[in-house]
Amino acid sequence: MISELSINVSQNGGACTYVLTGRIDSTTAPQLAANIHLEGVRELVFDLAGIDYLSSAGLRVFLQAQTTMNKAGGAMRIIHCRPHIQGLFSAVGFTAIMDIA
């Protein structure tokens, strides 16, 4: 299976939203990480409505973004998760340390 990830970014002042579509796996996670620019961002939102697969490599990208936002005093939210993606976040304990809906 060919891994594909579409990344659409919108920024409004200190708020930045990433709308992601496709798969986040060991092939596409580096692409996502390279596209996350947090300088001056106070509120970071990842919209995962279009994500149908998330691997540990993708989880690591979100954990790194959360850590960076915490150190900068900003906020991060992950929204519109499909049930199986929400279940994965819950199973690994991310729902205890991140704002995930």
Residue ranges: model-predicted function:
Residues S3-L32, Y53:
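STAS-typified acidic loop motif
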Residues S26-I97:
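Amphipathic alpha-helical interaction surfaces in cytosolic regulatory modules
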Residues M1-E4, R60:
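Short amphipathic beta-strand starts and helix->beta connectors
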Residues D99-A101:
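Short acidic-hydrophobic, aromatic-tinged amphipathic segments that line or gate anion-handling sites
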